[in-house]
Amino acid sequence: MDNEDKISISAKEEKILSFWKEQDIFQKTLDNREGCPTFSFYDGPPFATGLPHYGHLLAGTIKDVVCRYASMDGHYVPRRFGWDCHGVPVEYEVEKSLGLTEPGAIERFGVANFNEECRKIVFRYADEWKYFVDRIGRWVDFSATWRTMDLSFMESVWWVFRSLYDQGLVYEGTKVVPFSTKLGTPLSNFEAGQNYKEVDDPSVVVKFALQDNQGFLLAWTTTPWTLVSNMALAVHPELTYVRIKDKESGDEYILGQESLPRWFPDRESYEWIGQLSGKSLVGQSYEPLFPYFQDKKELEAFRILPADFIEESEGTGIVHMAPAFGEADFFACQEHNVPLVCPVDNQGCYTAEVKDFVGEYIKSADKGIARRLKNENKLFYQGTVRHRYPFCWRTDSPLIYKAVNSWFVAVEKVKSKMLKANESIHWTPEHIKQGRFGKWLEGARDWAISRNRYWGTPIPIWRSDDGELLVIGSIQELEALSGQKIVDLHRHFIDEIEINQNGKSFRRIPYVFDCWFDSGAMPYAQNHYPFERAEETEACFPADFIAEGLDQTRGWFYTLTVIAAALFDQPAFKNVIVNGIILAEDGNKMSKRLNNYPSPKMIMDAYGADALRLYLLNSVVVKAEDLRFSDKGVESVLKQVLLPLSNALAFYKTYAELYGFDPKETDNIELAEIDRWILSSLYSLVGKTRESMSQYDLHAAVNPFVDFIEDLTNWYIRRSRRRFWDAEDSADRRAAFSTLYEVLVVFSKVIAPFIPFIAEDMYQQLRGETDPESVHLCDFPHVVLEKILPDLERKMQDIREIVALGHSLRKEHKLKVRQPLQNVYIVGSKERKEALAQVGSLIGEELNVKDVHFCSETPEYVTTLIKPNFRTLGKKVGNRLPEIQRALAGLPQEQIQAFMHKGQMVVSLGEETISLDKEDITVSWASAEGFVARSSASFVAVLDCQLTEPLIMEGIARELVNKINTMRRNRKLHVSDRIAIRLHAPVIVQEAFALHKEYICEETLTTSVSVIDYKEGEEWDINGHAVSFVLERVER
C-alpha cells in the first residue's frame, strides 16, 4: 500500500470526526432516543496518570460497538465517562517526581501538600485520553464525567460503607494479608492475584533440634527471612513419618515417609530407625532456631502442632510456622494459643527485636540467615526453586504476607448472595461465569479495605479513647456532629476534625479506602446516590452492560459484585464482555522500554481506526484469549476487507453517475437470480448480526459481515459487472443498480456500530435528501423475511464451493485460471446434481472450463482410494485397526462409491461387523494421466488438464487481455477510455490475437491494433512468449 492511500484513509476519518463534531451527531443520537427505553452502561474508570494503550482501545471499542448498536436498536444510551483519581497509581507518580521515597518523607513534606500535588497530576494525560477515545471512533460524554475525588462521589462512598457497617458487614481485626513493602500498606487478595511472576527463590531445609537430644525435625521453606519469627512446627496427624540416622554426620532426622526419597535418594546413605505417626509428634517441643523470641517458650511457642493442610508432594511433610507471615500459619497458631510476633516494619525491614539484622530488608537478609544457620549446623540443604510469586500490581515489587490490623468487609458472610447474583449474569465468553469468576467467588475472603495511605477517600470512622465508634454516612451528619462546614472530604481537610459527644472526644482513624472500594461503589456514587438522582440510579440498576479485560474478574467485576450483593442482593450488571490481553508480536508483554510494539497513533494514522477496530473485533481477544498484536494484521484487514468495500462503493458511484441511475425510480423491477441471492444473503446477515448482538457475542457478529464483503465484491459485483456496463437502459441494468444500492445502504447500517467511519462515508455518498443526517441516526436494519431464500443461498453456496474446489485444483497443479480447459466433472449427491443442473455455464465461466459434467459416480478417469483415519479410528477399535485396514484395501469401487454417497459403511471382520462413518475414513484419488481430482465437504471435482491447440490459443488471448488491462490501470485511464495498441510478438501470439481479436478489443476497449517488427513499450511474458506493447489513449 502506498503512502497516498494511507494518508487518504487517515484524512477521510479525520474529516468524518469533524463532521460528527460540527453537527453534534452524538448528542443528536441521544436526543433522537429521548423517551425510549434506557440501555444502562457502566464505564470502568481509567487513571489519567498514564497514557492509554491497546488494552484500553480494545475495551473502548467493545463498549462503543455495543452502545452504538443499542442506540440504533431503539434505546436511549447515556455514556458518561469516569475517572479513577485516588490511590497508589497517583501517589506513586508524585512520590517519584518529588523524591519522597524514604520512610516518613510524606509526613515531613506534609500530607496536605502531598495530597494537593496528587490532585494536580490526576488529569496529566486527560487530553491524550480524549484524543484517543475520539480517534478510535468511540462516543462518550466528556461533559458529564464523574470523578472518584469529587465531594459528591466520596460522600456516596461513605454512604455505601455506612450501609455495610449497619448490616454488620464491617469489622476491625488482625489478619495475614498481602502487603506491599514498597507502598507500606496492605492490599486485597484480588490485588495480590493480578501480578504473579515466575521467580527463583531460596529453597532451604532447616534442622530443628528436638529437646533432650532426640534428633532433628527437617522443615522446608522458600522464605528464610521468616525463620527468625518461627513460633511452631506443624505435622499432619494422619501421615506417616520416619526416623533415620545419617551415616555421614551421625545425626538422626524425622521427616515424612513419602518425602524420604526426595532428600535421601541414596538408600545406602542412611540407617533406618523406624516409623512414627504424625499424631505421636504433636505436642513435642523443640529448641528455637534464633534467640530473639525464646522467652515465648513459656507462652506455648516452639511446639509441634497438628495441621491437616500439609501435603507430602513437596517439602518434608513438616511445616515451619511464622504466624505473622502466613495465613495458614496464623490460623493454626491462633487455634493453639501460640503467640504472634511480627518483627518486620511496613517497609519490609527487621525491627529492633532482631538485633543481628535490624534495619535490613527481609529479602536481602535471606543469604545472611542461611549463612548463619549453616555456621551453626542448623542447615540441612540450600538451593533455589523456581515458582510463581505475587508482585505489587503498581510498584512491581515482591509482596509479602503480613499480619496487620485492618478494617475488613465480611465478604464471606455474603458469599451465597454473590454466587446467586452471578447466576443471573450473562457472561461472554460463557465459561468465565462458572470458571475464572465463579471459582474466585467460591474462594472469596473477607476484604481488607483500609490502606495506610494519603490520597484516597478517608474511612469515616471516628473513635474515642475507650474504643467507642462513630461511623459517619454523610456530609450533613459530619457537619452536625462536628459543627464545621465540610467543603472537601480528603484527609487533610478532615483528619483534624474532633467530635465531642457524651463527654467523649472522637478522632478519625488514620486510614483511607482501598481505591477498589471507590470503583466498586461507582454505580451509586457517579449519581451522588442516595442524596441525588435516586430514582434515575435505581431505574438503571443493575447495568445492562459492562466490559473490561480478563484481569477485572478479580478487580472491578468482583468489587461491583461484592457491594451490589451485600447492599441490594442483586448483581451490579446483567451482561458483561470480557476481553483478553494484547501482547507484543513476539508473545511478550508490550513494553515501552523494549519498544516491542507500534504506537496506537502510528497504526491509526497508517491504516485507520476502522482497520484497527475490525482487526481487534475479528480476533480471539474478544473471546478472552490473548492476542499477539501485528501491524501486518491491521494492514491485512484494510487491504482485504475495507478497501474492497470502498471499491464496491466506488464502482456503484462511477456507473450510477455515468448512467444517471436514480434509486427512487426502482418500482416493479424484476430481479435476476444473483440479485435475489445477494439480497437474501444481506437480510440473513441482518438476522445473524441481531442474534449475535443479543448474546453480546461480537466475534460471531463480525465474522459474517466480513464474509459478506467477500460475497459482495468477489462474487456479486464481479459476476454482475457486464450488467452494470450495459450501454442500454435495460431492465436488467436497473435491477443490478437497484440491488447494489439497497445492499450498500442497508450494509452501511449493519456495519455502523463496528466500523463507524467507513459506514458513515458509505452512507453519506448514498443517502437521499430526506434520509437521516448520519448513519448513526438510523435504525438498525430489521430482517425482511420475504427476501430471505434459503434454497437459493444453499445453491449459491454449492456453486461457490465447487468453484473454490476447482480453483484449488488449478493452483495445486499450477494451471492458470486464464488458461481454458475442456472438461470438469462434478460428483455429488443426486439432489445436489439436480439443483445445480441449470448453472453449469456459470461454473464453467468461473473455472474457465468449456464443458461441465455433473455425475453421481466418480468418472472412469479417477479411482477413489480409502484408508482408516488412524487418529480417530484407533481410539474406536484399538488393536483391530490392521484388520480394518486390510478390509478397506480390498473393497470394490462400487462399495466405496456407496460410502461416498451415504457417508457410512459396515465392515465385516469375521463374524463381527463394525460401523464406520466419514470421520473414520480418509479419502484420496488416483487419476489417469491428464486428469486431477480433489474433494470438498460435499463434492468431488475432476479436472481434464489436457490442452488442445484451440485451448492454448484462447489462453494466450486471455493473458493478452489481462496484461493490456493492467497497463490501463497503471496509466490510470478512465473505465470508458478507448485505446490503440502497437504489438510486437512471436507468430503464435499474433495468430492468437488475430483469432480472438474481437474478444480482446471488446474487453480492453481497443479500437485499433498495429503489429510491429521491433520491441517497443512494456515487455510481458505471455505463457512463455516475450511480448511488448505500446498503449495510447484515443479520442472517441
UniProtKB/Swiss-Prot annotation:
Catalytic reaction annotation: tRNA(Ile) + L-isoleucine + ATP = L-isoleucyl-tRNA(Ile) + AMP + diphosphate
Q: Where is this motif: 'HIGH' region?
A: 46-56
Against Pfam families, the record matches this protein to: Anticodon_1, DUF5915, tRNA-synt_1
Is Ligase one of the keywords?
yes
Q: Which GO terms describe its biological process?
A: isoleucyl-tRNA aminoacylation
One Gene Ontology cellular component term attached to this UniProt record is:
cytoplasm
> Which GO MF term does the entry hold, naming one?
tRNA binding
- Which top-level group of life is the source organism from? Bacteria
Find motif ('KMSKS' region) and give its ranges.
589-593
Binding of ATP occurs at K592
Question: Any idea which UniProt keywords this protein has?
Answer: Aminoacyl-tRNA synthetase, ATP-binding, Cytoplasm, Ligase, Metal-binding, Nucleotide-binding, Protein biosynthesis, Zinc
| Swiss-Prot/TrEMBL domain comment | IleRS has two distinct active sites: one for aminoacylation and one for editing. The misactivated valine is translocated from the active site to the editing site, which sterically excludes the correctly activated isoleucine. The single editing site contains two valyl binding pockets, one specific for each substrate (Val-AMP or Val-tRNA(Ile)).
Q: What does this protein do?
A: Catalyzes the attachment of isoleucine to tRNA(Ile). As IleRS can inadvertently accommodate and process structurally similar amino acids such as valine, to avoid such errors it has two additional distinct tRNA(Ile)-dependent editing activities. One activity is designated as 'pretransfer' editing and involves the hydrolysis of activated Val-AMP. The other activity is designated 'posttransfer' editing and involves deacylation of mischarged Val-tRNA(Ile).
**Which HAMAP family does the record associate with it?**
Ile_tRNA_synth_type2 (MF_02003)
Assembly notes: Monomer.
- Annotated protein name in UniProt: Isoleucine--tRNA ligase
Originating organism: Chlamydia trachomatis serovar D (strain ATCC VR-885 / DSM 19411 / UW-3/Cx)
Its gene? ileS
